[in-house]
From Swiss-Prot:
Its EC number is 7.1.2.2. Gene3D superfamilies: 2.40.30.20, ATP synthase alpha/beta chain, C-terminal domain, P-loop containing nucleotide triphosphate hydrolases. It comes from Orientia tsutsugamushi (strain Ikeda) (Rickettsia tsutsugamushi). This is ATP synthase subunit alpha. Keywords: ATP synthesis, ATP-binding, Cell inner membrane, Cell membrane, CF(1), Hydrogen ion transport, Ion transport, Membrane, Nucleotide-binding, Translocase, Transport. Belongs to the ATPase alpha/beta chains family. InterPro entries: ATP_synth_asu-like_sf, ATP_synth_asu_C, ATP_synth_asu_C_sf, ATP_synth_F1_a_nt-bd_dom, ATP_synth_F1_asu, ATPase_a/bsu_AS, ATPase_F1/V1/A1_a/bsu_N, ATPase_F1/V1/A1_a/bsu_N_sf. It holds the Pfam family ATP-synt_ab_N. GO terms for cellular component: plasma membrane; proton-transporting ATP synthase complex. F-type ATPases have 2 components, CF(1) - the catalytic core - and CF(0) - the membrane proton channel. CF(1) has five subunits: alpha(3), beta(3), gamma(1), delta(1), epsilon(1). CF(0) has three main subunits: a(1), b(2) and c(9-12). The alpha and beta chains form an alternating ring which encloses part of the gamma chain. CF(1) is attached to CF(0) by a central stalk formed by the gamma and epsilon chains, while a peripheral stalk is formed by the delta and b chains. ATP binds at G169, D170, R171, Q172, T173, G174, K175, T176. Produces ATP from ADP in the presence of a proton gradient across the membrane. The alpha chain is a regulatory subunit.
Length: 512
């Protein structure tokens, strides 16, 4: 019997119509062993390093090691539900996290999921957690100031937008307090209509207590700073994998603003705990330990994170991402492995000393070994001129004070230098949650270096400073606006400042 072509065609057509198309084609592997957040998986020979795997329980993992017929994946979160023999699928994607202005005012976990009970994000932009840092040709020099509101930093250790500045010191020396004050200081720029002046903040808490972070978030909400801030939390009770991912997630959130022509500030608190989490993962993966049991690539761990902070050029939108990593030292030992690594990666460090902190100097900055390698280029001329004199007078004061310890008789000029140095040191002290605008800082330091506090008792310096600024705000706001608009102290501004300060000092008896 001979079949007609039309009959064959109709039969094939009917069969194809009844054919169920596979909804999904995926590579599947199986868990050989699971423990301590590390899964050994067989059967996914085409997986690549950094790829996201999907376990049958719904949990996700990241490929960390590739071996013959075997891969090792780090489970993101808890591995309680994963058993030996569980099915694992490739996703053929790397980890992406939600970013955008929708995240402002929110608290998210290490992979960007909201944990503040305010609901899911509606339309976020998803970005890769691990990306290459901008190339040299995409960058511009650091030329815009990042105002911290802290006199000692803005004058002596200035930070620019796009800089990486390390905050380093022993526990309980005020490292987080400085970071929070910097976030609070950005509020004054968000109250203005100039979008270019606004700085969006990302605070990454690594290995901290949830109660501590809750207090911090409450403070940001009370001051109105949460409106332009995102908090990324990976608490001490979270898995090492989440503590490892948190800084990269925070960086990706900041990169959204940087790449869209805006300014962002990301604070990593702190990278010591981040390194410890990575050390734990590496030892569980049986990677060979090096100095202090850290793996050999711990430098790359932090360099690839911090190199993503950048000031982009005009062609790329002139956005910036400023990074403030925090590192905790043991007994002020800055020569330990992680501190020296991060010091060599960053553009300077703010060193906090426990001795100064216990003496009541807050912020407890050691001006001698704190440095900013690129921020001075971003300082406005008015601050640069005053800061130079402040640095010189403080250096002379510390040298002369050390000399006076020997009980030597000092002449009148040396005594005057010591007296002024003491008052300048007192001026640089600052209470927490009290940021100063740049024009206020310039006026305060101008008064200090020109001898207007020489007759003020050291114990009354803070009171004098407060009343002087109040006098300027009420009676001379025009001079403050003039300093900001011109960005330098002209002869006219200088003579006006001298005149106002001379009149104010006539009532000095109450402070002497």
């Amino acid at each position: 019997m001979q079949l007609k072509a039309s009959e064959v065609y109709e039969a094939l057509k009917k069969q194809l119509e009844d054919f169920d198309e596979l909804s999904e084609l995926s590579e599947v592997g199986y868990v050989i062993s699971i423990g301590d957040g590390i899964a050994k998986v067989y059967g996914l020979s085409n997986a690549y390093s950094g790829e996201i795997l999907q376990f049958s329980t719904g949990t996700k993992g990241i490929v960390f090691s590739l071996k013959d017929n075997l891969i090792e994946a780090v489970v993101i979160g808890s591995d309680d539900q994963i058993k030996q023999g569980s099915q694992v699928k490739r996703t053929q994607t790397s980890l992406k996290v939600p970013t955008g202005k929708e995240l402002l005012g929110r608290v998210v976990d290490a992979v960007g999921n909201p944990i503040d009970g305010k609901g899911e994000f509606i339309n976020p932009t998803y970005l890769d957690v691990e990306v290459k840092a901008p190339s040299v040709m995409c960058r511009d020099s650091v030329n815009e100031p990042m105002y911290t509101g802290i006199k000692a930093i803005d004058a002596l250790i200035p930070i620019g937008k796009g800089q990486r500045e390390l905050i380093i010191g022993d526990r309980q020396t005020g490292k987080t307090a400085i970071a929070i004050d910097i976030i609070l200081n950005q509020k004054r720029f968000h109250l203005s209509d100039q979008e270019r002046e606004k700085v969006y903040c990302i605070y990454v808490a690594i290995g901290q207590k949830r109660s501590t972070v809750a207090q911090l978030v409450k403070k940001l909400q009370e001051t109105g700073a949460m409106a332009y801030t995102t908090v990324v939390l990976s608490s001490a009770s979270d898995a090492a994998s989440l503590q490892y991912l948190a800084p990269y997630t925070g960086c990706a959130i900041g990169e959204y603003f940087r790449d869209n022509g805006m300014h962002a500030l990301v604070i990593y608190d702190d990278l010591s705990k981040h390194a410890i989490a990575y050390r734990q993962i590496s030892l569980l993966l049986r990677r060979p330990p090096a100095r202090e049991a850290y793996p050999g690539d711990v430098f790359y761990l932090h360099s690839r994170l911090l190199e993503r902070a950048a000031k982009l050029n005009k062609a790329k939108g002139e956005g910036s991402l400023t990074a403030l990593p925090i590192v905790e030292t043991q007994n002020s030992d800055v020569s330990a492995y992680i501190p020296t690594n991060i010091i060599s990666i960053t553009d300077g460090q703010i060193f906090l000393e426990s001795e100064l902190f216990y003496k009541g100097t807050k912020p407890a900055l050691n001006v001698g070994i704190s440095v900013s390698r690129v921020g001075a280029a971003a300082q406005i001329k008015a601050m640069k001129d005053i800061a130079g004199t402040v640095k010189l007078e403080l250096a002379q004061y510390h040298e002369m004070e050390a000399f006076s310890q020997f009980g030597a008789d000092l002449d009148s000029s040396s005594m005057q230098l010591i007296n002024r140095g003491r008052r300048l040191s007192e001026l640089l002290k600052q209470s927490q949650y009290c940021p100063f605008s740049v024009e206020e800082q310039i006026i305060v330091l101008f008064a200090g270096i020109n001898g207007y506090l020489d007759k003020v008792a050291v114990s009354k310096v803070k009171e004098f400073e407060s009343n002087m600024l109040e006098h300027f705000r009420i009676h001379n706001p025009d001079i403050m606006n003039e300093i900001i608009s011109t960005k330098k102290i002209t002869e006219i501004i200088s003579s006006k400042l001298h005149q106002i300060l001379q009149e104010f000092v006539k009532s000095i008896e109450q402070y002497s």
